[in-house]
Amino acid sequence: KVSASSQLKEVAIADIIGGMDIVKGELIVEVVNEAMTVRGDADLGAVPISLTWRRNFGDTPVFRSRYQIQGRVEQEQWATSLGFDFAPFTGETIRGPSEAKVTVTEFDDRRREVRAKLDLTETQLLLADLKWIKSQGVPGTAQVDLTMHGDRVRVIDQFTVEAGNLEVRGSAQMES
């Protein structure tokens, strides 16, 4: 049986989640037998987050890594820090901050499952083509569950947006 624990400060890890880096980490690392758990606070790009990362080392784990991330994303950070420089993450659609909870699970076959939940209460949403606006302060949520292979989205298992008087649900299968 093997176990170790350490508290780390000012940690930077390159290319940790989908090619993104974490910096300014204040992390606790625990290793027990064939798994490592990392917990703490860091910046993902310029977005302050709370992170729990589980890494399994065995030969046939159920999953290889799982990242649970929680943070507040300001409107401009979608593009500048997270690389989401496309609709609906642009200033034409989203204005204001969103509270985000994201779980990314990585498997040995290069598959990734992503579940993202956003609290849109403080976010203004604008759908100009539909002449629809959700004002800041009006409750709203968005959720997406998707499956990736490598860096490509293969399946959007489900997505929902419930905000004000708008309710959108769907799924999508991407072509190879």
Residue ranges and their predicted role:
Residues I13-A116, T123-S176:
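Interface amphipathic segments
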